[in-house]
UniProtKB/Swiss-Prot annotation:
Record HAMAP family: Pro_tRNA_synth_type1
InterPro entries: aa-tRNA-synt_IIb, aa-tRNA-synth_II, aa-tRNA-synth_II/BPL/LPL, Anticodon-bd, Anticodon-bd_dom_sf, Pro-tRNA-ligase_IIa, Pro-tRNA-synth_IIa_bac-type, Pro-tRNA-Synthase_IIa_type1
Family designation: Belongs to the class-II aminoacyl-tRNA synthetase family. ProS type 1 subfamily.
PANTHER family in alphabetical order: MITOCHONDRIAL RIBOSOME PROTEIN L39/PROLYL-TRNA LIGASE FAMILY MEMBER (PTHR42753), PROLINE--TRNA LIGASE (PTHR42753:SF2)
Alphabetically ordered keywords of this record: Aminoacyl-tRNA synthetase, ATP-binding, Cytoplasm, Ligase, Nucleotide-binding, Protein biosynthesis
Record's GO cellular component terms: cytosol
Protein name: Proline--tRNA ligase
Localization, UniProt: Cytoplasm
NCBIfam families cross-referenced by the UniProt entry: PRK09194.1, proS_fam_II
E.C. no: 6.1.1.15
Oligomeric and partner information: Homodimer.
Domain comment (free text): Consists of three domains: the N-terminal catalytic domain, the editing domain and the C-terminal anticodon-binding domain.
Gene source species: Pseudomonas paraeruginosa (strain DSM 24068 / PA7)
Length: 571
């Protein structure tokens, strides 16, 4: 492809509204343009990258036995009403009416549509298991779209849905999708981690997220430094570093603590080690009208997902108001603790191993110091309630935990029968009895992968595409293309490279565009290999080569270039 016949829309300046590096570089490289809040047009250069992601995804899904379909983006309200999600889904669901006043939505996801398809097309166990997928545009009406493709309102997603008679069949397909996703992100050249995840409101028995590691990631992911254990921060099990509770060495005493409403004030005002303090948080109980106290160590953070999964606690998690707390306990936040606590209490595992600790006395402006379990009060229910911290023991007993930032680009779920029961999807079993099908769902944010790849692969000059994603493999840059010898040599080399199957962008812009601008544009675009043709080089029988990740260029004999490039691109 010649730049004279292509849309090369690079920008020198970074648009003011672009915050994250992927958004900045996608705009500067002329790969996308903003149409409206959270809506982007893909320009030819960016579309080449997007199509490469789609190709790898499609190849691996096909290899895993999934069948491609294409479902409508606009969906009838009746299906969502049938599943119960029409009322449950928030304002992110874009609803509309047609000229006949029938209600529809623009699909943020396709569980209802695929379940409707399955109940109309599947009628026998002999058709199972089966796995459908599509690559389709989705829409979620985010209140504050931001970060370009990372959190837009319209996005491109690969979503797959599988149907099974039993859990064993689902597990086999789920494992196959796990392997397919691992192959996809490996082929795309991304540094990623699959992590255990919480199913949340989706339900089901298994879930994994796939995260691209990047400092700009929105999510904390946790993995062992010595094993394959990995989980997101919501799911990671927090194992105490202490193996046993220390012996009591202080008597419990009541201490006046005026104006001490925070852990920081307690530590600073009384010289206490933070690991000898606790935080008491009060939430609504599962039984209507009840409250439950959740206690974590002062230097730890409550994991709200783990808390909401406790049988005594209401889900979703609702924190009690100060008025509710005072009415139930007689003291306000900052003075709460487990001693003489009149409501149910759950303590974190690390709290259960504490000795000689400080806790609110449930009396305004007073704390107990030197508190010890079993001696001063019975040990209440113990559960894993906190977020892990770096250096915690790995739950599998191998090594310690490392925490890094990640960008979620894929998620696989074992859905169970949530949709098949709600929408009456069943087939006849081998015994001739109707059986509700068990479902799995598997998503990849195709357009988000493009942004995540840039977040992980860039430098001060622009994008550093992994080779599988680069819009072109080779940038061919002639100096003084108007010179006959340079033009002939460049055109000949361009013909040879394209005939060999390489994707080449020939920068044939005229002499008004300086070599420096050409080089800067090719680096901004992230094209992995650059070849420079010049009069001087031709006179010396060489071409200049520079890899995008190289610090220095090198001269290659003209006759060796094809074998050199072929070897480079075969790695």
């Amino acid at each position: 492809m010649r730049t004279s016949q292509y849309l090369l829309s690079t920008l020198k300046e970074t648009p003011a509204d672009a915050v994250v590096i992927s958004h900045q570089l996608l705009l500067r490289a002329g790969m996308i343009r903003r149409l409206a809040s959270g809506l982007y047009t893909w320009l030819p250069m960016g579309l080449r990258v997007l199509r490469k992601v789609e190709t790898v995804v499609r190849e691996e899904m096909n290899a895993a036995g999934a069948l491609e379909v294409l479902m409508p983006a606009v969906q009838p309200a009746e299906l969502w009403q049938e599943s119960g999600r029409w009322e449950q889904y928030g304002p992110e669901l874009l609803r509309l009416k047609d000229r006949h006043e029938r209600e529809f939505c623009v699909g943020p996801t396709h569980e209802e549509v695929i379940t409707d398809l399955a109940r109309n097309e599947l009628n026998s166990y002999k058709q199972l298991p089966i796995n459908f997928y599509q690559i389709q545009t989705k829409f979620r009406d985010e209140i504050r779209p931001r970060f370009g493709l990372m959190r837009g309102r319209e996005f491109i997603m690969k979503d797959a849905y599988s149907f099974h008679l039993n859990q064993e069949s689902l597990q086999a397909t789920y494992d196959g999708m796990y392997q397919a996703y691992s192959k996809i992100f490996t082929r795309l050249g991304l540094d990623f981690r699959p992590v255990q995840a919480d199913n949340g409101s989706i339900g089901g028995s298994g879930s994994h997220e796939f995260h691209v590691l990047a400092n700009s990631g929105e999510d904390d992911i946790v993995f062992s430094d010595s094993s394959d254990y990995a989980a997101n921060i919501e799911k990671a099990e927090a194992v105490p570093r202490e193996s046993a509770r220390g012996a009591a060495s202080e008597d419990m005493r009541l201490v006046d603590t005026p104006d001490t409403k925070t852990i920081a004030a307690l530590v600073d005002g009384f010289g206490l080690p933070i690991e000898k303090t606790i935080k008491t948080l009060v939430v609504h109980g599962a039984e209507e009208g009840t409250l439950v106290a959740l206690i974590v160590r002062g230097d730890h953070e409550l994991n709200e997902i783990k808390a909401a999964n406790q049988p005594l606690v209401a889900s979703p998690l609702v924190f009690a108001s100060e008025a509710e707390i005072r009415a139930a306990i007689g003291a306000g936040p900052g003075s709460l603790g487990p001693v003489n606590l009149p409501i149910a209490c759950i303590v974190d595992r690390s709290v259960a191993l504490m000795s000689d600790f400080a806790a609110g006395a449930n009396i305004e402006d007073k704390h107990y110091f030197g508190v010890n379990w079993e001696r001063d009060l019975p040990l209440p229910e113990v559960a894993d309630l906190r977020n892990v911290v770096e250096g915690d023991p790995s739950p599998d007993g191998k090594g310690t935990l490392v925490i890094k930032r990640g960008i979620e680009v894929g998620h696989i779920f074992q859905l169970g029968t949530k949709y098949s029961e709600a929408m009456k999807l069943s087939v006849l079993s081998e015994q001739g009895k109707p059986v509700n099908l068990i479902m799995g769902c598997y998503g990849i944010g195709v357009s988000r992968v493009v942004a995540a790849a840039i977040e992980q692969n860039h430098d001060e000059r622009g994008i550093l595409w992994p080779s599988a994603l680069a819009p072109f493999q080779i940038a061919l840059v002639p100096l003084k293309y108007e010179t006959e010898s340079v033009r002939q040599a460049t055109d000949r080399l361009y013909a040879e490279l394209t005939a060999a199957g390489f994707e080449v962008l020939l920068d044939d812009r005229d002499k008004k565009t300086s070599p420096g601008v050409k080089f800067a544009d090719m680096e901004l675009l992230g094209i992995p290999h650059r070849i420079v043709v010049s009069d001087r080089g031709l006179n010396e029988g060489v071409l200049e080569y520079k890899g995008r990740r190289d610090s220095e260029s090198q001269n290659l004999p003209i006759g060796e270039l094809m074998s050199f490039i072929t070897e480079k691109l075969s790695r």
